[in-house]
Amino acid sequence: MLVMLMMEELLTTRELAELLRLNEKKVYQLIKEGGIPHVRITGKWLFPKWHVLRWIDERVEREENILIAGSDDILLGRLLASYSRERFPKSVIFYSPVGSLKGIQCLSEHKAQACCLHLLDVETGEYNLPFLERHLSSQEYIVINLWHRKQGLILKRNNPLGIKGLDDMVRRKARFVNRNKGSGTRLFLEYLLSQKEFHETEIVGFTDEVDTHLEVGLRVLFGEVDVGLGIEYVSHLLSLDFIPLQEERFDLVIPKELWPIRVMKEFVGSIDPANIRRLARSLPGYSLKDTGKVLFKS
C-alpha cells in the first residue's frame, strides 16, 4: 500500500490546506477525526492527492460536504470560514473560485452543489437570471441574494495619472491588468467597452490576466500596472484609490433537489442579515439590502 501511495502525487500539510482552503490546524483535526487519507514518512504527514479528491467526492455523496464553485469574493470566504469553524469536521464547505460562468458550468455538470455569480446581461441589464435561464434550462434551482458590492477602477494611491473613468484609462494608455475569461468582472469590462465603443486592442494589457480581485490590487500596489477592475474592499485593504462604476448583485444558486439536505439547509441558515452584517463590519463596498432574499425559484 505504501508503495502505491508513493507513486501518487503527495501533498504536504500546507499544500493540502491550500487545496481545501482550510487552516493547517484544521488539517491535523481531519487526520484525527475525519479519516482523510494520509501517510507519515520520516515524521511528516503526507497526503496522496488522488485519494484525497476521492475522499472529498465520497463525503459529498454522503451529503457531509458541499462544493461551491463560481466567483471570487472576500466576504464569501469569511462566511465559509465562519461556518466551518462552527461545524468542522462534521460538515465542510469547499469553495472553488473559478469564475461565474465556470461556476454555472460546474453546477450544470453536477460537479458542484452550488454556485455564486455576478453576471450582467448586456441586453436586459439584469444580473444573473438571464444566464441561468440559458445555461440551466433543464434544471430546477433556487436563487438567493448574498449581497451587493461596488465594482470599479482600482488605481495607484493619489491617482498620479488623473484617471477619472474608463475613457481616461484608454486614452492615456494606462497599463491595465484584466481578470480571467468567464469571470463576472471580465464580462462587466467587456460590457463597458461596448457601451463606450472601445475595442479591446485599445487597452494596454487586455490579455494580462489574473484570477482574483486581490491579485488585481497587488499588481497595482507593486507598480506593475496602473489600473485594474475590482471590488472596493481591495482598494481599501491596500490603501489604493477607487473609482466606483457599478453596484452589482452577488447571488447564490442551489439546485432544488439539494435544498433539503442537512448541510445545505445549515449553510443557507447562516445567510442571515445579522450574521452577514457582523462578518462584513470592516469591509467597505458591500450592501446587505437584499441579503438572504429568495429572488427566484424555477
Model feature map: region roles:
Residues 1-102, 111, 135-141, 166, ...:
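N-terminal hydrophobic or amphipathic helices and topogenic motifs
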Residues 9, 143-150, 236-269, 290-291, ...:
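Periplasmic-binding protein-like
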Residues 64-72, 167-187:
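Short loop->beta-strand "edge-of-pocket" segments that line small-molecule binding or catalytic clefts
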Residues 92-99, 200-213:
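Short beta-strand-to-loop elements that line the ligand-binding cleft
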Residues 103-150, 220:
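Short beta-strand-centered segments that line the small-molecule binding cleft or hinge
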Residues 118-132, 217-246:
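A ligand-binding cleft/hinge motif common to bilobed small-molecule-binding domains
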Residues 146, 155-176:
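Flexible hinge/capping segments at coil-to-helix
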Residues 157-164, 198-199, 257-263:
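Short helix-loop capping/hinge motifs at secondary-structure junctions, enriched
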